[in-house]
Amino acid sequence: MKKGNKTVWNECIDILDNVKSPSFSANFDDYFKKSKSKPPKKNKKVLNNIKKAELKLKKKANKKQKANTLYIPPFAQQAKGIVITINKMWKNVHNDDSKQEISILSDVSLQIAYGEIVIILGSSGSGKTTLLNLIGGYDSISLGSCIVANCPLEKCTSEQLLTYRKNNLGYVYQRYNLIELLSAYDNIAISQNLIPKYQRRLDIEELAEKLDIKEILYKFPYEMSGGQKQRVAIARAIIKEPKLLLCDEPTGALDSNSAENIINLLQTINKTYKQTILMVTHDVSLTRIANRIIKISDGKIVSNQLVRPLV
């Protein structure tokens, strides 16, 4: 695969984070056949290479497991109405200079209810993104426990964490992470294809209308403004109706007007779909939409306030 094609494939890996799961390939063929956008002809070879690379991963995964084996995460019972339960969680890393372990997250304990908007505040290097990555199953827990949607993350294998993310999470990045060779519609559809048809309740065009992106649905990322790209990224994240929407500085790359629109949009999504939202930011102005505000400093939670209880 040429360098340019490899870059596109890596984008798919970063965004979907499920490509090593055999289930991803199931609808890949149908997806491109039914695609409503028509990328330039020169991109067809690139898309075919993406498909071929995915099929190779599928074959490799199948050799390592028995037929029809599912990587089902372990189960832990949480209190009713609670989506996240963290108890004395630590994240340690090895310091090459001192040859000792240092703690970048220390003794974290908290509970978050379904439907809350949680704003996690902290300066750069405070540990707020580390906390988000641990909740998302993107990093390993050193000590303690983290249960999300009845799944104890510290007990999961890497394959089980893939299943956990596919079934429970949507992720919104600061830099959008849209696949440049796909239209807005296809960027959203490729996420929807990760779930079986019988589980799909949201229609892409109806969702696009609610998120005010219907007019750009068949445009490519290079034709969009920053605010439009972030709206598409949010649509991609919520199309599969995740239990938890993780947002890492979602307004950090936007101008003030676009940022305000995204903030209002996230609040609307929370009210319309009862979506639980965890948002990492250094922007204090975002706290106006929060149910809960968590402040982190030097890897520790210094404040955890429920400022607006759920009705």
Swiss-Prot record:
Residues 84-310 form the ABC transporter domain. PROSITE patterns: ABC_TRANSPORTER_1, ABC_TRANSPORTER_2. Keywords: ATP-binding, Nucleotide-binding, Transport. It comes from the Bacteria. GO terms for molecular function: ATP binding; ATP hydrolysis activity. InterPro entries: AAA+_ATPase, ABC_transporter-like_ATP-bd, ABC_transporter-like_CS, MacB-like_ATP-bd, P-loop_NTPase. Disulfide bonds: none annotated. ATP binds at residues 122-129. CDD domains: ABC_MJ0796_LolCDE_FtsE (cd03255). It holds the Pfam family ABC_tran. Belongs to the ABC transporter superfamily. This is Putative ABC transporter ATP-binding protein MG467. It comes from Mycoplasma genitalium (strain ATCC 33530 / DSM 19775 / NCTC 10195 / G37) (Mycoplasmoides genitalium).
